Amino acid sequence: MNKDLTEAQQDYAHFLPALSGFYATYVGKQRYPDPVKGPYVPASRMPNNFANDMESLNYLNKSEGAFQYKWTLYSAGHAELDVNKFSPKEDMVRNRDRENTWMLGDSGGFQIGKGVWEGDWKDPNCPKAQKKRDGVLRWMDAYMDYGMILDIPAWVARSPAGAKATGISTYQEAVAATRINNDYWMKHRTGACKFLNVLQGENHADADD
């Protein structure tokens, strides 16, 4: 049975389920069996009512998914950003049906705030920060319909790991670093992805900034 959940949501604001890397990996890797080990998930572990193998769980696949849902959210924070690198685990996203699906890309600002994406984000010439800045942009333009700007969270200065990894110690420094990202993206974007602004702030003064 192929249940179209998209049609059931026409009278509501569109809910965007956050597609996890874990979920996408199962769908993507199942498409490319290992020459030696075989399928990522062996047939013996596949439920009998999955008419189309693991593809039954791919809700972005209109013809083979057990259910279909058009809209979804996917984060650059757990994606393979190198668009020139073959990555089976990303196949659910990279090779989706663009005419019948819509995807919003989360930029990975949370990873910056938590110190996972290290670099001096205040410096537009920092190699580590620039690699992520450019990588997320290329990834967005290649695979996303809409995307969030690469914002530096206002709370990064309160995150010990984040402040240490990014060199950002104040709210204003976070704003300045976000502007660096925005300027780079505006200059180098292809226009394939439309970008949404992110409003940051922890109080009324920040919100008015």
Which stretches of residues belong to each language-model region?
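Non-catalytic, usually N-terminal nucleic-acid engagement modules in DNA/RNA processing proteins
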Residues: 1-184
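Glycine-rich phosphate/ribose-binding loops and adjacent secondary-structure elements
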Residues: 2-6, 190-209
